[in-house]
A protein has these predicted regions:
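A structural motif corresponding to the C-terminal lobe/cap of the Radical SAM core domain
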Residues: 1-161, 188-192
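General helical structural elements
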Residues: 89, 165, 181-183
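A conserved cytosolic signaling coiled-coil/coupling helix that links sensory/transmembrane modules
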Residues: 92, 167-169
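Intrinsically disordered, low-complexity N-terminal regions enriched in serine/proline/glycine
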Residues: 114, 143, 168, 179-180
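Short linear elements at protein peripheries
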Residues: 169-195
Length: 195
C-alpha cells in the first residue's frame, strides 16, 4: 500500500464479483475467501485510496438475497464508486459453452442481435429471471440515489476532499447514475422475453 501511495495512485478498481462466498468459489476468487472485505476497505480508505468496486449478478450459486447483501456491503464499507453488472456469457468462454449445453441461453447468437449491456441472456439457476432483473434494478436505484451517494461521499477517503478528488468521485458516480437510470427508464427486454 505504501508503494502504491508513493507512486501517486489515488484509487483502485476491485472486482469483488460477489459478496456471497459460494459465488466467489464458483468464479475461483479463492484469495477473496480469506479476505475480510470490510477490513480491506477500512485499510484502503485509511491509506487515502478511493475504491471502485465491481459486482456481477447471475452466478449459479447466488440467490435473491445477494442484492440486499451487496447494498449493505456497499453502504457499510462506504465504497466510493460502484459498478453493477449482469453476468454476460461471451462466446468462446466456458460459461457460454456450459449454458449452451444446459439449454439455458435465451438466444445463441445474442452478440449479433445488438443486445445492450446488462441484458439477461440466460436462465439463472438460483433465482428466477424476474427476480434477477428486479433485484438488479432495485439495487441500482438504491446505490445511485442521491441520498446514498451523499452518504458514501461523507465517509470517504481524504483524496475526495481535494478539488480533483471531488471531481473524480462526482463524475464517476453521476455518469454511472445517468447510465443506469436512463436504462431503467427505457428498459430493454431480456433476450427470452420476446419472440
Amino acid at each position: 500500500l505504501d508503494l502504491m501511495k508513493r507512486s501517486g495512485c489515488l484509487g483502485l478498481f476491485i472486482g469483488f464479483e460477489s459478496v456471497q462466498k459460494a459465488t466467489q468459489n464458483e468464479v475461483m476468487k479463492i484469495k477473496n475467501l480469506r479476505i475480510d472485505f470490510y477490513e480491506a476497505m477500512r485499510r484502503f480508505h485509511g491509506e487515502g485510496f478511493g475504491i471502485l468496486g465491481s459486482f456481477v449478478f447471475g452466478f449459479d450459486y447466488e440467490n435473491k438475497d445477494v442484492f440486499e447483501q451487496t447494498l449493505e456491503f456497499i453502504m457499510r464499507s462506504r465504497m466510493d464508486c460502484v459498478e453493477l453488472r449482469i453476468l454476460t456469457p461471451f462466446p468462446g468462454t466456458r460459461l457460454y459453452e456450459r449454458l449452451l449445453s444446459e439449454g439455458r441461453l435465451f438466444v445463441r447468437d445474442w452478440w449479433l442481435r445488438g443486445y445492450p449491456p446488462d441484458t439477461l441472456l440466460f436462465q439463472p439457476k438460483g433465482m428466477t429471471a424476474d427476480e434477477l432483473i428486479s433485484g438488479f434494478s432495485r439495487l441500482n436505484r438504491q446505490t445511485y440515489s442521491f441520498g446514498a451517494m451523499i452518504k458514501r461521499f461523507f465517509g470517504m477517503s481524504p483524496w475526495k476532499r481535494t478539488l480533483f478528488g471531488c471531481q473524480v468521485y462526482a463524475g464517476i458516480n453521476l455518469s454511472t447514475r445517468k447510465r443506469y437510470f436512463k436504462g431503467l427508464r427505457n428498459p430493454q427486454p431480456f433476450a427470452g422475453a420476446s419472440n
